Structures are given as structure tokens and as C-alpha cells.
Amino acid sequence: MDYLPVLFSLLLVVFQGAPEAAVLGAELSTGPDSGGEKPAPSAPWRPRRSKRCSCSSLLDKECVYFCHLDIIWVNTPEHIVPYGLGSPSRSKRSLKDLFATKATDHRNRCQCASQKDKKCWTFCQVRKELRGQDSMEKGWDDQKKGKDCSELGEKCTHHQLVAGRKIRRLDAVRNSIKTAFRVAKLKAEIYREKKVTHNRTH
């Protein structure tokens, strides 16, 4: 007789779960007929990750930060953390998209999702031009290495002056950073010594 309440509650639980099981079975049976295109109405809506553009290299952290709108730059070394969305679903790429991106010019920094997004286009193209200028300057430096400027003319002299100024400026910045670190280290040591002597006096 003691088993009657337990048996009754067990039957109650089974019958309460039965309609849900029947509905689930009906959904499973109608799924293949409809092609599985319609999602279940009870499925929760998940936000899709919208990308402003797609970077040609994921090692380009600035591009990744610019293109992926929901990623917040967190100051951890070599780490970008998606923050606040709980890893939303991403749309799958088709083979056409894959071959289209392979066929595009790899010198572009990124590829914009919208053709009307002028800021995105300028971001992707300007960086390409800057990289072209850098490579031209590198080629110019390689060309004038070991050569006297009398052969190359005024342009060579100007480049040498600019390069000399840049090197001096970089050296000055490097030295100021080193001295700032030394001063901070000395201050930390003095503070530590004061703290130790203060603890000993009391």
C-alpha cells in the first residue's frame, strides 16, 4: 500500500510528458517530408554575427577588430575576445564564396560586405596603398644601399636626410622609454625600502 502514492506520481509524470513526446514525434515525422527547411516554431531566435567585411588575414588584428562589429578589443596579449554575445551562430560559406575570395586580389586588406559602406572601402583600400608605398620605400632603400648619392641625385639626398631624422627620432624615443623604465624601477625600489624600514620601526 505504500507503493501506491509513488506509482501514482510516476504515472502522473509519464502522462504529463506524453503530449510533448507526441508533438516531438510528429515534428520528427513531418521533418523529412517538408525538407527540413522550416525551423521549429519553439526554437529560440539566436542573433546572427554581422560582419562589416572579411579580412584577408586573421593575423591582422586591426582588420579583425574593424570588420567584426561584435568583437571588443580586450587588452590581453595576442588575444581577441568575443564579449557579450555568447558565441552567436555564423552563416556558412558556400563554395562560390570560397572560390570568389580566392580569385580576388590578395593585395587587398579586406573585402567589404556592403558596396555602399564607404568607410569600409577606404579602410581596405588605403591600407593597401600604404603597404605599396612602404614596399616602394623599401625598394628605394635597397637600391641606394652601398651607393653614393652623387649618382642618384637630389632625391637620394632627401631620402637619406629623412631616414637619418627618422632614425634619430626613434633613438630618442627609445632612450626616453628606457630612462622612464629606469626611473620607475628606482622609484619602486625606494618605495619598497621605505615600506620595509617603516615596518621595522613599528
Swiss-Prot record:
Keyword Endoplasmic reticulum: no
Signal peptide: 1-25
UniProt xrefs under InterPro entries: Endothelin, Endothelin_toxin_CS, Endothln-like_toxin
Disulfides per UniProt: 53-67, 55-63
Region annotation (Disordered) ranges: 28-48
Site feature: Cleavage: 73-74
Cell compartments where the protein resides: Secreted
GO biological process, one term: regulation of systemic arterial blood pressure by endothelin
Gene Ontology CC terms, in alphabetical order: extracellular space
Region (Endothelin-like): 110-124
Family stated for the protein in its record: Belongs to the endothelin/sarafotoxin family.
Function, as annotated: Endothelins are endothelium-derived vasoconstrictor peptides. Probable ligand for G-protein coupled receptors EDNRA and EDNRB which activates PTK2B, BCAR1, BCAR3 and, GTPases RAP1 and RHOA cascade in glomerular mesangial cells. Also binds the DEAR/FBXW7-AS1 receptor. Promotes mesenteric arterial wall remodeling via activation of ROCK signaling and subsequent colocalization of NFATC3 with F-actin filaments. NFATC3 then translocates to the nucleus where it subsequently promotes the transcription of the smooth muscle hypertrophy and differentiation marker ACTA2.
Protein's recorded name: Endothelin-1
Organism of this sequence: Felis catus
